[in-house]
From Swiss-Prot:
Listed pathway(s): Secondary metabolite biosynthesis
Disruption phenotype annotation: Leads to the accumulation of terpendole E.
Biological role: Cytochrome P450 monooxygeanse; part of the gene cluster that mediates the biosynthesis of terpendoles, indole-diterpene (IDT) mycotoxins including terpendole I, terpendole K, terpendole C, as well as the kinesin Eg5 inhibitor terpendole E. TerP has dual activity and is able to convert terpendole E to 13-desoxyterpendole I and paspaline to 13-desoxypaxilline. Terpendoles biosynthesis begins with the synthesis of geranylgeranyl diphosphate (GGPP) by a yet unidentified GGPP synthase.
PANTHER family: CYTOCHROME P450 (PTHR46206), P450, PUTATIVE (EUROFUNG)-RELATED (PTHR46206:SF7)
Compartment(s) of residence: Membrane
Protein name, entry field: Cytochrome P450 monooxygeanse terP
EC numbers on record: 1.-.-.-
Positions contributing to heme binding: 441
Keywords: Heme, Iron, Membrane, Metal-binding, Monooxygenase, Oxidoreductase, Transmembrane, Transmembrane helix
Single GO MF descriptor: heme binding
Cofactor(s) this protein cannot do without: heme
TM ranges: 2-22
Gene name tied to this protein: terP
GO CC field: membrane
Length: 501
């Protein structure tokens, strides 16, 4: 097997060298004179060197571009594409442009290493299912989803936390929350039977990790090289094996449900079955792939990152931790037996912390990723050309003192006294990380419920502290190109308290 892999690698070398030469020539002959380019290397060097070094310097390049060209577009040279960063002043008119002109699906496909992962391509079926079935259900005054999120996430007690009151257990928070998120979301996405399948649950958690590692590799290598060498990468091979397992499992479930039309199911998989409009969308394997892709990456992975960031924020501030615990006790005086939608809405300080934590620690530098499908002339005459990839530098905008007072300061209660429009899940030009317009993240309301459910229950039932015992210390983030991750190595000690649930 190793010799076969080596042979395949050697066969790829001439192709890669030829591609690098072509890319070098394109850089020399295809200069874009209308958009300033932010470079790490001096102008006399080829742009290809900037592409190679982008991931090591992304944060500094974005900061420099925003500082110099805050009110005009600038260009970044990524390994797999040119990215045109659009200023905030265009946000209002861009959000109204339809997907036939500004394509969010292809941009998401490219950003998620679609050639290697095979997720999120082809249609907006998943968005339709969330908009038309999931989100309306969250708005109904009911305990249904609140109970699902907490009971399924914490089955009888969390097996990877000690069940013995008073004992400290070492835990890696990201892994803990990844498992909790998977359990909570699986019930809503695949139904009651499959959500209890431990192999499926572990596969979903592992698929999230492997897919993210695949995406990181893809961004380092670029689209062409990544596609050619991807099959040699362990995370790619493992993710594909897991994808095949899920295709078989969920594909069989789709066929079984179609054979038993009298059965009633209320989950994401069934919503996609019901709402599929084309033959391709309705294929069992396509439904399975879409379900695992959305569940693992759009729901579980992003929820796990946001919740882990918040836990680290709480670790660094014992006063905040106690204040939030008091809020949960006031909102839920009888414990989780009394949870409902109204209780979730009363968690104003927790919601404020969620938004502020995401402002400081978003998933990445950019939002509103789009591919320009048709030429667009904006109100001031600026033209977007067909084929360009564009994005808005959400992180820099939200950290700009001209946009937000005292923007460099982390203030957990910043949004607690504001109106509902300032909530974590509200999408606007002042809360950009969920995107803008009709294509803003459709699952942000469900994500808000998940994060609140998991964090609130941890606050009510557990004490936690850093294994190192360092007070006031927050484990540093991990930066991968223009993506921002919580520390996935920090060890935290958890101890269950005596509570009445």
């Amino acid at each position: 097997m190793p010799s076969l892999l080596l042979s395949l690698l050697l066969l790829q070398v001439p192709i890669i060298c030829a591609w690098l030469l072509v890319r070098f020539i394109i850089d020399l002959t295809g200069k874009n004179g209308t958009i300033p380019t932010i470079r790490r290397w001096p102008a006399l060097f080829p742009e290809f060197l900037d592409r190679l070094s982008y991931n090591d310097n992304a944060a500094q390049l974005v900061e420099e571009g925003y500082r110099k060209y805050k009110d005009r577009p600038f260009r970044l040279l990524k390994m797999d594409m040119d990215l045109v960063v659009i200023p905030l002043k265009y946000a209002t008119e861009l959000r109204a442009i339809t997907s036939d002109k500004l394509d969010p699906l292809t941009a998401s496909f490219d950003d998620n290493a679609g050639e290697l992962t095979g997720i999120l391509l082809g249609s907006e079926l998943h968005s339709d299912a969330i908009h038309r079935r999931l989100t309306p259900g969250l708005r109904i005054p009911s305990t249904k989803y609140c109970r699902i999120l907490t009971v399924c996430a914490f089955p009888e007690r969390v097996g990877y936390l000690t069940d013995v009151i008073g004992n400290w257990t070492p835990v890696i928070p990201y892994e803990l929350v990844l498992r909790l998120s998977t359990r909570a979301a699986a019930r809503v996405f695949v139904g009651e039977t499959i959500c209890r399948d431990e192999v499926f649950l572990e596969t979903c958690s592992s698929f999230s990790r492997n897919t993210f590692d695949t995406i990181a590799t893809f961004r380092n290598l670029g689209k062409t090289i990544g596609f050619m060498l991807g099959i040699l990468t362990p995370s790619v091979r493992k993710a594909r094996e897991q994808g095949a397992y899920v295709q078989k499992l969920l594909g069989s479930e789709v066929e079984r449900r179609r054979a038993c039309p009298d059965e009633k199911h209320d989950d994401f998989l069934q919503w996609c079955i019901d709402l599929a409009r084309t033959e391709q969308e309705a294929k069992p394997e396509a439904l399975a792939t879409r379900t695992i892709g959305i569940l693992s990456m759009a729901v579980v992975h992003t929820t796990a990152m946001a919740t882990t960031h918040m836990l680290f924020d709480l670790l660094a501030d014992s006063k905040l931790r106690e204040t939030l615990k008091k809020e949960q006790e006031d909102v839920l005086p009888s414990g989780w037996d009394g949870i409902d939608q109204n209780s979730m809405l009363k968690m104003r300080l927790l919601d404020s912390l969620m938004r502020e934590s995401q402002r400081i620690n978003p998933v990445g530098e950019f939002t509103f990723r789009r591919v320009v499908r048709k030429p667009i002339t904006l109100s001031d005459g600026y033209q977007l050309r067909r084929g360009q990839q564009i994005a808005i530098s959400a992180r820099r905008i939200n950290m700009d003192g001209a946009t937000l007072e005292d923007a460099q300061t982390f203030c957990p209660s910043r949004w607690a006294q504001e109106t509902q429009g300032a909530s974590f899940s509200h999408s606007s030009s002042s809360n950009l990380h969920f995107g803008l317009g009709r294509y803003a993240c459709p699952g942000r309301f469900f994500a808000s419920y998940m994060i609140k459910a998991i964090t609130s229950r941890i606050l009510l039932e557990y004490d936690f502290k850093l294994e190192s015992g360092r007070e006031g210390y927050r484990p540093p983030n991990s930066i991968q190109g223009d993506k921002i991750l919580p520390n996935r190595d920090a060890v935290v000690l958890f101890r269950r308290r005596e509570v009445s649930i």
